[in-house]
Amino acid sequence: MFLPSVLAASNLVKVQPGLIFWTLVTFVIAAVVLKWKAWGPILSLVEEREKQIASSIESAKRERAEAEKLLADQKTAIAEARREAAEMMRRNTQEMEKFREELMAKSRKEAEELKLSARREIDEQKAKAIAEVRSMAVDLAMEVAGKLISERMDDSKQRALAEQFVQGLPLNSTSATGAVRRTA
């Protein structure tokens, strides 16, 4: 309602062929001037911006690829370092075990040698003690036999004489090694 009355009153909405012509001429002149003076610089700015964006994208891709490569290299280096550390620990454990076994074998050997040496010494002392006791027994038997032969006696006198002779001998005691020692 209101719109048709406004449109009817206005001269701007009326189609006027002269106005259309001059509007088209002005538009074409403006388009030619813009194309001639402004279109080139605008297009070059747009192209330059496109190149800059493409360059930034390529640079970002390269940097990302480089970062991924560095990350992979670091992961590989860390894995290698862990592997080397594990190998070193394994080697050290083996060497420590070998050293412990060698030390135990050496200790056993030394203990066995000490044991054998002590046993030899004990056997020597025992042999000396037995030889000494035998020598004393022979001497005693010879003395008793000599006295018995020199004096003919009855059994009670012989026993008394043997006891008297034995009492005159120095006392003997046996040590822990089995050796006989004379004491006063």
From Swiss-Prot:
GO terms for molecular function: proton-transporting ATP synthase activity, rotational mechanism; proton-transporting ATPase activity, rotational mechanism. One of its GO terms (cellular component) is proton-transporting ATP synthase complex. Disulfide bonds: none annotated. It is a single-pass membrane protein. Its main location: membrane. The keyword Ion transport applies. Keywords: ATP synthesis, Cell inner membrane, Cell membrane, CF(0), Hydrogen ion transport, Ion transport, Membrane, Transmembrane, Transmembrane helix, Transport. The chain crosses the membrane at residues 15-34. It is found in: Cell inner membrane. Pfam families: ATP-synt_B. F(1)F(0) ATP synthase produces ATP from ADP in the presence of a proton or sodium gradient. F-type ATPases consist of two structural domains, F(1) containing the extramembraneous catalytic core and F(0) containing the membrane proton channel, linked together by a central stalk and a peripheral stalk. During catalysis, ATP synthesis in the catalytic domain of F(1) is coupled via a rotary mechanism of the central stalk subunits to proton translocation. Belongs to the ATPase B chain family. F-type ATPases have 2 components, F(1) - the catalytic core - and F(0) - the membrane proton channel. F(1) has five subunits: alpha(3), beta(3), gamma(1), delta(1), epsilon(1). F(0) has three main subunits: a(1), b(2) and c(10-14). The alpha and beta chains form an alternating ring which encloses part of the gamma chain. F(1) is attached to F(0) by a central stalk formed by the gamma and epsilon chains, while a peripheral stalk is formed by the delta and b chains. This is ATP synthase subunit b. It comes from Myxococcus xanthus (strain DK1622). The gene is atpF.
